[in-house]
Amino acid sequence: MSVPGAGPAPRSRLLLGLAAGAVAFAAADTYVVVLALVDMMQGIGLSPEQLQRAAPIVSGFLLGYVAMLPLIGRIADLRGRVPVLTAALIVFAFGSILTAAAYDMTTMVGGRFLQGVGGGGLVPATLALVADLYPAHRRAIPLGIVSAVQEIGSVLGPLLGAVVLAVADWRAIFLLNLAVGLVLAAAIAAAASREGVAGRGASAASHETASPRVVEQRGAPATSGPPPVVEQRGAPATSGPP
């Protein structure tokens, strides 16, 4: 375990790195479908001329993502950071397989919504994990990194989609999500078990960061981008998917 006032142990850094990677991957899924929308519509029997009907495929994800932000902080305080992170990844993976198997718009949008619910749960739980692993005066950099990887994931989403579409069909995007989500969930659980990080808010400071809305820290600029995640003492502003 970490010595009070010092940085986290190497295994704790690994745990935080895995959580940040999960945040980036989920953020990428916001717009990973942009280049696949026409193929996805054809997969459920809609023509390219009905492209306007594809909007819920993107907005369904965003709705689930934003809906979870005010709720997960408190749940992470009560149930623990790692259980919430792994549960969020499992929900994300389930939404991915539901989307991959979809043959109508309702099922597809439902799957995307569940992906958003899982992805939205990762952000506050990861911020709370930072508060557990780092003393207050050393949180600016790790919190900034979490915000940065979220933004990077959102930007790289369409590129990831293009790479997958170059070698497979649109359903492969969501099968990849399924595999990565389950692998990250298992890796986070294993890393937490080896380090002994379980997590029900270790301090008042961690409760602050876990709470739904995260705010700009003194001296740390707020990040811009997708739906803002929040303001609260002790953490820099972060954001949801664009």
Task: Briefly describe each language-model feature range.
Residues 1-28, 33:
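Cytosolic juxtamembrane N-terminal segment immediately preceding the first transmembrane helix
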Residues 43-45, 80, 101-107, 135, ...:
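Helix-breaking motifs and short loop linkers at transmembrane-helix boundaries and internal kinks
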Residues 36-67:
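Extracellular/periplasmic helix-loop-helix junction of adjacent transmembrane segments
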Residues 114-148:
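Cytoplasmic helix-loop-helix junction between adjacent transmembrane helices
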Residues 166-242:
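Hydrophobic transmembrane-helix bundles of small-molecule transporters
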Residues 59-73, 123-127:
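Central cavity-lining transmembrane alpha-helices of secondary-active solute carriers
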Residues 67-105:
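Conserved MFS/SLC helix-loop-helix module at the cytosolic interface between two early adjacent transmembrane helices
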